[in-house]
Regions:
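Metal-dependent nuclease catalytic cores that hydrolyze phosphodiester bonds in DNA/RNA
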Residues: 1-130
Length: 130
């Protein structure tokens, strides 16, 4: 397993001070849309929300072709799989033991593709989503 170096001192005092005082952002979900809320009360959409705004014509044609029940099942399954892969990536970057994830065959296979092609190019980690 690759071991990632988590850099805690960037040798840039001003940036270190900012990183140490960053508040934890709160989140709210409205109609299945997640927003991050700043201490000033500003709401910013999650990347998933931003990407979901893209043209959905192809997805709507697919949904019409397969029906709502199948489309909902496939969408829900894909979302759960994506969440599992996301957690695996976080654990991997945090140098955690990946053994417990092996029981999730498909998400683990997808994670391994990411690890082999993308995550392997990461060395120093300066900040990470919590």
């Amino acid at each position: 397993m690759t071991t990632f170096n988590h850099v805690s001192d960037l040798n840039i005092p001003e940036l270190n001070d900012v990183l140490m005082t960053l508040p934890e952002l709160k989140t709210k979900t409205f109609d299945r849309t997640r927003f991050y809320i700043t201490p000033e009360g500003n709401h910013y959409p999650s990347i998933t929300t931003v990407l979901s705004i893209r043209n959905k014509e192809g997805l709507m044609k697919w949904r019409k072709r397969v029906g709502d029940d199948v489309a909902n099942y496939v969408s829900r399954t894909a979302a759960m799989r994506g969440t599992k892969v996301h957690h695996m990536c976080e654990d991997y970057l945090n140098n955690e033991n990946m053994e417990r994830h092996k029981k999730e065959f498909l998400p683990y296979a997808l994670f391994n593709q990411l690890a082999d092609k993308a995550l392997c190019n990461i060395d120093n980690i300066y900040a990470q989503e919590c």
